[in-house]
Regions:
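N-terminal helix-turn-helix DNA-binding module of bacterial transcription factors
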Residues: 1-24, 294-298
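Bacterial carbohydrate/catabolite-sensing allosteric modules
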Residues: 6, 47-52, 76, 100-107, ...
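Flexible, nucleotide-binding loop/lid elements of kinase catalytic cores
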Residues: 16, 59, 278-279
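Alpha-helical recognition/docking segments in bacterial nutrient-uptake
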Residues: 13, 21-133, 137, 198
């Protein structure tokens, strides 16, 4: 083997492709590369693919359905053996293209027992229900929610649905909740937080659709001279590393990103190699209570 290395030998990839009738390439389209929400899971996805002899091609849709559609077409045209997509929601034209091309496709970052499309992910609605119950258990009755735009984003929409259902089940009136939809950016989270807190009846707890928005809210609270959680509680979603290192540390929903990435890679390779028709796996999430959540001010 050392002699092979010394000679600079490279395995004949073309021959391998022809023999297997595959390119040993997997495409993944994620909504953004600008924050850490997808990084950890995608890293684990790539590691597992590499162990199985596959190369990963990654594209970002910038949360734009038309961009995602163009990238799907490009990856299909380049002969990707399989695709990893984020979330269920996309247009009929793209679903028809994927079916017509017969390309194995797996969805991640979400799970629904009623959706037939193979997925490895978690129940966004159930996760938000669990977090909202914790917030209510602390005595909060005026809630703010900073969300990404729910149109064309089933993950964001399901989190909002879970929040609304929980507040309704608790008997709270409609005006107990204020929702602002915005970009998944730190500054956007801060702007939405300030708008809520300067209203006539500000919330006592601000829940955020992910940790990036929550960090923006924390930073803006400090700039406004507000104590967290003394004046207002703040929660996130994802349990990124930054949720543990900010001050105060964020109460959030832990999402098993690395496990999700590895299991998604295993299932998608099985689908590509025709060892599976595609099965769905639901992963557990759990609430991590940290310093940013406490009882409302008196």
């Amino acid at each position: 083997m050392r002699a092979v290395d010394d000679l600079g030998y490279t395995p004949n990839f073309g021959a391998r492709v022809m023999a297997a009738k595959r390119t040993f390439t997997i495409g993944a389209i994620i909504p953004t590369m600008e924050n850490a929400v997808f990084a950890r899971g995608l890293q684990a996805f790539q590691e597992e693919l590499r162990e199985r002899g596959y190369t990963l091609l990654v594209a970002s849709s910038a949360y734009q359905p038309d961009v995602e559609a163009a990238q799907i077409r490009a990856l299909v045209a380049r002969g990707a053996d399989g695709l990893l997509l984020i979330g269920y929601e996309r247009g009929h034209e793209i679903n028809h293209l994927l079916a017509a091309q017969n390309i194995p496709t797996l969805v991640a970052w979400t799970y629904s027992g009623t959706n037939a499309q193979p997925s490895v992910g978690f129940d966004n609605r159930a996760a938000m229900i669990a977090l909202t119950r914790k917030v209510l258990d602390h005595g909060h009755r005026r809630i703010g929610f900073i969300s990404f735009y729910v149109q064309d984003n089933d993950r964001a929409r399901e989190r909002l649905v879970g929040l609304k259902e929980t507040l309704q089940d608790a008997g709270l009136p409609d005006d107990a909740l204020r929702v602002i939809e915005t970009q998944y950016e730190v500054e956007s989270g801060g702007d939405a937080f300030e708008k809520m807190m300067r209203s006539a009846t500000p919330p006592t707890a601000v829940m955020c659709g992910n940790d990036v928005l929550a960090v923006g809210a924390l930073r803006r609270a400090r700039e406004m001279g507000l104590s967290v959680p003394g004046d207002v509680s703040i929660t996130g979603f994802d349990d990124l590393e930054l949720a543990r290192i900010v001050t105060p540390a964020l109460t959030t929903v832990h999402v098993p990103h690395r496990k999700m990435g590895r299991e998604a890679a295993r299932e998608l390779v099985k689908m590509v190699e025709k060892k599976s028709l595609g099965t769905s796996t639901e992963l557990d999430t759990w609430i991590v209570i940290r310093e940013s959540l406490d009882r409302p001010p008196r």
